[in-house]
Amino acid sequence: MPLDQTSKLIAIIDDDEAMQDSLRDLLEAAGLAARCFGSAEEFLKSDLHCTAACLIVDIRMPKMSGLELQAKLKEEECNLPIIFITAHGDARMRIQAMRQGAVEFLAKPFDHQLLLKRVRSALNM
């Protein structure tokens, strides 16, 4: 099934460029379109701010964390599906993210097939 590149674009928000590249390669190999952002602030200034089909977000980033980004989007009524990935997650963080509406919360290293399944589910594919 061909993707509409504008309505099915996945935003990757992570301050680690190697992780951005790895996630983008994984998604593109699965036939999905992705665009990378090095910070929550960069994403908020972009044209995908409230229009991305799904977000893959690192929890811990300089300045604005993934959880703060999630709260900001909620304030602005941007109801985007968010999948969190983190190397520093704990139960409290996971509960907070899920209560705020996260689709998934994956600890690094994570299962690539599980991530793809969650992304496809968020995209209703």
Task: Kindly give the residue locations of the regions a language model identified.
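Acidic catalytic/metal-coordinating carboxylates
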Residues: 38-39, 65-69
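Short, conserved "switch-loop" micro-motifs in signal-transduction and mechanochemical regulators
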Residues: 76, 88-89, 100
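A Lys-centered signature of the CheY-like receiver
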Residues: 108
